[in-house]
Amino acid sequence: MWYFSWLLGLPLAAAFAVLNAMWYELMDDRARKRLAADPTAELALEGNKHH
């Protein structure tokens, strides 16, 4: 019966990885568009970085 957890878990993990990558690409595209529209936006974003 252990194989049921693998049968359900692997596709779920793969779907989560794909959705995570799609979200990252969406956020990256938004940031690039914002930066292209306003080049000074990068300076404002640098102040929000936590080291």
UniProtKB/Swiss-Prot annotation:
It catalyses: 2 a ubiquinol + O2(in) + 4 H(+)(in) = 2 a ubiquinone + 2 H2O(in) + 4 H(+)(out). Required for correct functioning of cytochrome bd oxidase. Keywords: Cell inner membrane, Cell membrane, Electron transport, Membrane, Translocase, Transmembrane, Transmembrane helix, Transport, Virulence. It comes from the Bacteria. The chain crosses the membrane at residues 4-26. GO terms for cellular component: plasma membrane. It is a single-pass membrane protein. Disruption phenotype: Highly attenuated in macrophage-like line J774 and female BALB/c ByJ mouse infections. Loss of viability in stationary phase growth in culture. Increased sensitivity to H(2)O(2), acid pH, highly sensitive to the combination of NaN(3) plus NiSO(4). It is found in: Cell inner membrane. It is an enzyme of class 7 (translocase). Residues 1-3 are cytoplasmic. Residues 27-51 are periplasmic. One of its GO terms (biological process) is oxidative phosphorylation. Belongs to the cytochrome ubiquinol oxidase subunit X family. Pathway: Energy metabolism; oxidative phosphorylation. May be a subunit of cytochrome ubiquinol oxidase. Its EC number is 7.1.1.7. Its main location: membrane. InterPro entries: Cyd_oper_YbgT, YbgT_YccB. Induction: Expressed in stationary phase. Part of the cydB-cydX operon. The lineage of its organism: Bacteria, Pseudomonadati, Pseudomonadota, Alphaproteobacteria, Hyphomicrobiales. This is Cytochrome bd ubiquinol oxidase subunit X.
